[in-house]
Amino acid sequence: MFALVYAIATPVLALSTGRFRRYQLLVCYSIVFVLGNLVMALAPNFQVLFISRIVLGSVSGALLAVGVTYIPELLSPQQTSLAISVVYGAFSVAMVFVTSIGKFVADTLDWHVAMYGTLTFAVLICGALVAFMPRAGQTDEPATFREQAGLLREPSIITGMLIFLFGVGSVYVFYGYVTPYLEQVLGMGTVEASTTLMAYGVFCLISNILGGWIDARFGMKALLVTFVLQAAALLGLFAVGGTMPLALVFVFSLALLMYLFSVSCITHFMDVARSRHPKSMVLASSVEPMAFNVGISFGTAVGGAVVSSVGIAYVGAVGAVFSLVAWALTLVTIKLARWERKRTMAQA
């Protein structure tokens, strides 16, 4: 539910708040984010906890999207890709590494303790954002719904979002069920599985940073190699079954490949916005969280269907097919982006 609300609310808020200044949005989203975490920590029952998660899902993507728009203004073009990769790397590691820590704390102490830890981080980080981010900038000019929505009609933006749908979906067919995979297929205990997930998170961080380095040097064309390797890793999981330690080699290889494509797609979205839709920079930075979380929901749903029908051992094979679809979409996006650049130059 969190991922679904996140995916829907992020672009909706970007489109509907274009008339407000960016710093005002940053403050408002930060306040709601902290209050959502406070309610979650104090939740007396599951119903209140569920509502707090919906509130958090509704502003988390918007807060991330607004924050990312500061990066091109604070850093040089050469540093932007790496900075974006660090931001999304931290986000990705939180989904894997910190989730494992939270699960461990909840299992050994109490789930409220884990929520208080989350609240503490929320207060510290949001406080730092509000205190140190510039009050004004290039993206503060008011924008109407129509001025922003034009970005979503660009063909290469549409295919770029589909890259996320199938690229993220290919991994989450497997990763959505990684814990039962580790325990049922590889025969790990609870502690071993948690340790493996923490190591997986470290590889995910490396994946994001490496993705920034690759994007700065090779751009989107590097994804044509990335998705072939990702398909190979997923097929490897299917082929080796529960054979240890070979299966772990493919698991960690997949973690290393998992986010290599993210920065290149984000850079593409923001480049298109900067060159042809300059008032839609916040929306451009919202596209990734939206598409990413739709990909999570899509991949997890397909993975669930696979697990309940043919069995968890087949998630790798299905994920590999999605990786190849993402490869084809990357090729189309590269060609469309080239055509759009030529069209823009001709109109200049």
Residue ranges and their predicted role:
Residues I8-F46:
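Conserved MFS/SLC helix-loop-helix module at the cytosolic interface between two early adjacent transmembrane helices
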Residues R21, L42-V48, V59, S76, ...:
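Helix-breaking motifs and short loop linkers at transmembrane-helix boundaries and internal kinks
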Residues L119-Q138, T330-T333:
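C-terminal membrane-cytosol helix-exit motif in multi-pass small-molecule transporters
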Residues V272-V310:
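A late C-terminal transmembrane helix in Major Facilitator Superfamily
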Residues F46, S52-F91:
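Cytoplasmic helix-loop-helix junction between adjacent transmembrane helices
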